[in-house]
Amino acid sequence: MVTAASGRCGFTPQRREPRGSPCRCPRLPARRRRPGTDTAAAAVAESPQELQAFRDYGESWYRSRKGLESRFQPREPLARQPQVTAEARCKLVSWLIPVHRHFGLSFEALCLTVNTLDRFLATTPVAADCFQLLGVTALLIASKQVEVHPPSLKELLALCCGAFTVQQLRNLECIVLLRLGFDLSAPTISFFLEHFSQVRLQAEGADAAEAADARILAGGISELSLADYAFIGYAPSLLAAGSLGLADRLLGHRRPLDLRVSGYPEELLRDCMEQLQLLVSLNGQSLPLLLPPEVVQKCPWLRGGR
């Protein structure tokens, strides 16, 4: 079992204060901003070169990533965890969501973080006192994959109330990489959201504004699903298609995405959308915090949550 106190993550930390859940960590300082990511229009804004690249390679890249889903999807990651529960996982991922936003990281980085976390949990028992450290370690590994400027070790550890050392973080990073065989490039919900949104824009008479709003709302719904263990068995491509379908429905779009592009049977898509609808209804106060104001204004049923 990987623990902090036993030194398997490094040296025993010098505890300056009692270590609690992630929610007890200090308030996040001012958020870094990624240029062009805070508006709905930015969700689908692409250069002519990028659009042409999608036309040339988008479908083959999609088939390649979809073919890898089963290989990277963890199976019951908590089955071997005597100390980590679904509730603890929910709290950790719910904490990582604002942390990744604070650092200005992409949704792709968050998806890879949760995938790395779950795949490691499926292979290795983790002690409760090491779980938060595992979360920031997974975030660090994911950020190194897809971000130009990943957060520093010092920045990440500062969010853990000084409970862990740099050496512990480095040691756990090595353990995670070894257990996963350095096999990290998992297909993500983020990738499939972008792909289906681009497919939508290629259709005749596509409404770019509707596509942008649906993409952003679907992204918020997908973030909520990452924290809910009930969605662990859903493939990323299915969650992406279901989130976009639900977003179109909630926004009352006249030209919704044709969900047949996902290749999933109608009944499977319907089940996924129903589960996501329940998730949204249970998180009416949280979802607006994940969305820009201009999208919230188009969702009357969400305005009370702001």
List PLM regions with ranges.
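Acidic, serine/threonine-rich low-complexity regulatory regions at protein termini
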Residues: 1-306
